Amino acid sequence: MPRKLFSKMPTTQGRSFYEELRGHDSEGYDGGSRAGLLDEENLNHNFQDYDLDHAEGLTVDDSRATLAGLRKTPASKVPPGHQNDRSMWLAHDDDADNDVPPSLLVEPRGAHLAGKPKRKQSRQAAYTMPGSSNTRAQWETIQAHQPLHNDEPFTQSHRGNGAPGSLFSGSASLDAKKMAEWRWANVQNLDKFIKEVYDYYRGCGIKAIITERVLHLGNVAFIAVLLTFLTQCVDYSLVRGSQKLSQIIVPQCTRKMSGWWNLGLWLFAFYFIWKAIQYILDLHRLFHVRDFYTHLLNIPDHDMQTITWQEVVARVMALRNQNSKTATTLTPLQRHFIGSQSKERLDASDIANRIMRRENYLIALFNKDILDLTIPLPFLRNRQYFSRTLEWTLMFSVLDMVFDEKGQVNQKFLRADRRGEISEKLRSRFQFAGIMILVLSPFVSLYLVIYYFLMYYHEIQKNPSVLSSRSYTPLAEWKFREFNELPHLFQKRLDMSKAFATHYMDQFPKVKTEMVAKSVAFVSGALATVLAIASVFDPELFLGFEITPDRTVLFYTAIFGSIWAVAHGMQSQDDVVFDPEYAMRNVIEYTHYEPDHWKDRLHSYDIKLEFAELYKPKIVIFLEEILGILTTPFVLFFSLPKCSDQIIDFFREFTLHIDGLGYVCTFAEFDFKKAMANAKKPSDGGDVRDEYYSAKHGKMEASYYGFIGNYGNFALNPKGAPGSHLPPGMRNQFHPPPAWPGLNSPPLGADMQTSRMGRSEFRSRSRAPGQGLRPGPSMVAPSPMASILLDPHHLPPSHLVNPGRASHPHRVQQNRRPGESNIIEESLEDEERGREGVNRHDDEEVYGHGDGMDESAWQTSPARTLSRDNSAIEGTGTAEAGVVDMIYQFNQAQFTRNGV
């Protein structure tokens, strides 16, 4: 609705700004980036006949298109929006293309593509049988009696995106699975479809979604009826002397309501009817998504509450692999569409990018501190303010303007010459949003107060301590959230951190406060004890004796008892250790938020005050939400318009286009091939440019390792381990104790030479033969292929997973005790090699044989890797190695020599 209002505003150019954006997108213009550039992707593509429909004006003259050919083209044959693109291609044509022999030309010099009739004649000529006249006559006779198949180009149906005619003709006999397959093959907006799949997952199935919507309408209707009855249909002046409800009810109260209340009821009726119709019309889409889960992903509706999102992603990837791309003949319009809607980009990273395309930009805006959220008041200028209301206005003012209906970034936001115009439009949107908040603030604030009062009153009455419970503020949630982190995964991480955050906040203040609390508890407890003992000897005194006028012993006993309870609650328990730094580190393990100025200061009181602004009592957050409806217009009118230029520059400089995925935030596209290499390099600070184009507070590293941990690559990020969001080199390594008793024990050493005792049938296949349990980090790291939710182009290189994974025999010999070198277990090693062969065969069956994979280093056994240290020792085995093994050994030697 607001977007349409903006589009109707008059402009000096005759067309509104938003009409230009829509017209610009429909033409398929790529922000000026196509000018002067060759389409290298389609340079060697096999174009078909219907591709020439878009190039009727091209003249084959010396193997290039000429301007003369364009002048001969009728105006009606040129599609709109293609003239400028064609001129750009012609302006940058290279003269070297003229050196083509005439024999290699498709048509002789001077030939002209006259249209479809000539192409049809050329195809008929291609069927002519070469040879003598008798042979050609026989061929024509056979062709007349048995004509060849019709090779006419495929023409798109005029029904648009509807099902094929064969499907419609037999729709009565089609089952739901075939229709689900057809809808999956004809998805037009992949971003929208993936979001629908994710929303269906979060809603726990169609039954839960419908139930939630019906109950929502019922709750809203109940609130409206209850408020109308309590405010308009009850005469409270008659309550004191009445005995029945009918005595205080106003007859025909609906006819006596005020005009404002009637207006509110009409608005409620409009909202109720609008939501009901919306829910009813949305049932068709819900059933389609249900069929997608049930028939294509094999996930029934009753499993939606227990299945994990990672399993859903794995099944979507398997479905994509079953329906691989087979079309090799695409029109330019279809290629432009596939540029952002390709189903080939559907692994865990791509799915998260499609769902979080808009939110990733907002996360980066908060991380880069681009948004000015201060209130322009003298006593609140240095305090950032953010509420849900302001979050909604940012979604409307910024994101709805940047992204089009297809979910892609508007091209004109990427052009520097439109910076001033777009910035002015953004300021006007901020001001319009502020006006709308001022108009709707009375209704919204009243609804929130009544809704939360009715919801939490009973809980507060039963458990008053709920008022002191804390939660993260909306600003803290956007600061803690990571790139490509889906909402349910982020909420899970926050919920796990709240217990540690509460424990941290309970440690402040302590010493002086506990001293005062102990004194108050002692005095109040002593007085309450004296009054209680006196009431035991004389119960009548307890009820009737007045210590002060109209205040009996019972009253003061209750007062002193309450004071003692409050003072005792302010004291820490005896078994609680005061260590704020340790408590804050536990919080950071889950929030992944540690600004640079927090380092080495986690114990300070300043850090506690800063964290208290992010973790506030729920009652304070609720009051800020109510007041935020009144203060948000000040931020929209005065603070945010000042940073509109920086916002436009941010979208232009931090937007990246990925083939098959579209435009995404640069921070959201994880460079898996460089992340681990950068994590192992010491940070040298960098220059100002690197600091500007990088995320703050380690957000990129935390997002990368958090993503790897969420989607199951335990080789890079063990799930649930302390410091799991940190790089492997920054986590504390586990050092197992040595075996006991030692192998140098004479009785044990003698027995082990002739015995097979102590061998386990469940030994890890990743441990090298002969490598015992010893102190230090693990020698062999699992393969990065442990994550099946990433495509090969997203997997990190194998040599970056664990550069020290190769075994070093001389180090093993140094750690052995004097009697261990005499122990020989040749039969054990032979059996271990046989088991490795079986395990390697099992891995090939699970992951395939590596066809089409970018990295092939993991095709060899991790336990048999070579390095510069052990290449000489195992030199006898290299003579029988194949070409792949020799290349692998050479790469490992190079990486080891470089110290990677």
Swiss-Prot record:
UniProt PTM comment: Phosphorylated by ATG1. ATG1 phosphorylation is required for preautophagosome elongation.
Known catalytic reactions: a 1,2-diacyl-sn-glycero-3-phosphocholine(in) = a 1,2-diacyl-sn-glycero-3-phosphocholine(out); a 1,2-diacyl-sn-glycero-3-phospho-L-serine(in) = a 1,2-diacyl-sn-glycero-3-phospho-L-serine(out); a 1,2-diacyl-sn-glycero-3-phosphoethanolamine(in) = a 1,2-diacyl-sn-glycero-3-phosphoethanolamine(out); a 1,2-diacyl-sn-glycero-3-phospho-(1D-myo-inositol-3-phosphate)(in) = a 1,2-diacyl-sn-glycero-3-phospho-(1D-myo-inositol-3-phosphate)(out)
Membrane association type: Multi-pass membrane protein
Region (Disordered): 111-134, 723-873
Signal peptide residue numbers: none
Main location: membrane
Cytoplasmic side: 1-213, 284-434, 456-524, 573-618, 640-900
Self-association state and partner proteins as the record states: Homotrimer; forms a homotrimer with a central pore that forms a path between the two membrane leaflets.
Protein name: Autophagy-related protein 9
Organism listed in the record: Podospora anserina
Organism classification: Eukaryota, Fungi, Dikarya, Ascomycota, Pezizomycotina
Gene name of the record: ATG9
